[in-house]
Amino acid sequence: MTMNIAYIVPKLVNQGPVNVVQELVKQMMQHQHTCTVYYFDEGNEVTFPCRTSRIRFRERIPFNSYDIIHSHGLRPDVYVFFHKPFRCKAKCITTVHNYVIQDFSYQYNKCTAYIVGNLWMWSLCRHDKIVTLSKDAEKYYSKWFSVKKLTFAYNTRDIPVDASITDNEESQILSFKRNSILIGVNAALTDRKGIDQLIEALLYLESYKLLIVGEGKSKEALQKLSHKKKVSDRVLFMGYKKDAYRFLPLYDIFALPSRSEGFGLTLLEAAIYHKSVVCSNIPIFKELVDDTQVEFFELENIESLVKAIVNATQLKSLGESLYKQYELKYSPKCFYNRYLKIYLFI
């Protein structure tokens, strides 16, 4: 059975939820389903192998022309709440890509996070199914929704391993690295990503340097911290780079020191490149991988982080073990089969 599927996102930008939709569209179209991506705001960083259409929030898409309407994000979810017909043939699904109150608490004060988060959850009352990114997140959202309305689906990443950076970028990084062991981070620079912990750890890792690919509101604070700790000569901020996974071949260690994550797509990117990974021991990472595949550290414990980085440097088998886990549980085939099952049995 082939389906006609509409995806709704805020804008076509290089962010986790939009990348997930891109993977969904690629997989669905490879299996002969028809897809359309609707979006609200300008931006064309991410391209899709299907029709895309910019819409205004107040205009209604033809819900009953589709088998599935799949929204991603606050505005798309609220859009479905307001525009879904009372007699709707299409099944409406949302994928929730975060831990809503927890995530908003890093952006707003706790009161605002609580109010906005709960209003968002209330707006999902008209959706037929709510998909989370993990079993842990499914449990988290059971505070708002019945078990029957919830399910989970692990993400995937399907990226080229031969993608390269420019000669100037490579020369800059090699000149910075020299004979050091290079820790790499690809992330938006926010407090939630926990990159400050890596800068703190450099004090005790004299033979290591840190390369950060990404932009964000915490950049200035991170730069100030590197100067305060007198390690600024061992930290290189590369700024925002499209397809940041292209930098993975130059890293000796890939770090994910996050305080909170909905999933962690960069973990899968590192797996595809067979990289040794150090990550915080938050529930989502503990669910996705085990200590034979990555080196965990205790969040906010710099001594634990230093130990994990040293161990990951010595354990050459981590990257291969992580890649095997990716093939077993997070491959595009696994991703497609899971979502197909969700779509068919709502």
Feature locations, PLM:
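A charged, aromatic-enriched C-terminal amphipathic alpha-helix characteristic of glycosyltransferases
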Residues: 316-344
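A short, active-site helix/loop in glycosyltransferases that binds the activated sugar's phosphate group
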Residues: 125-149, 157-161
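Short hydrophobic beta-strand element within catalytic cores of glycosyltransferases
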Residues: 276-279
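Short His-centered aromatic/hydrophobic patch
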Residues: 71-77, 96-99
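Conserved acidic donor-binding segment of nucleotide-sugar-dependent glycosyltransferases
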Residues: 291-302, 310-316
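Aromatic "clamp/platform" in nucleotide-sugar-dependent glycosyltransferases that forms part
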Residues: 240, 259
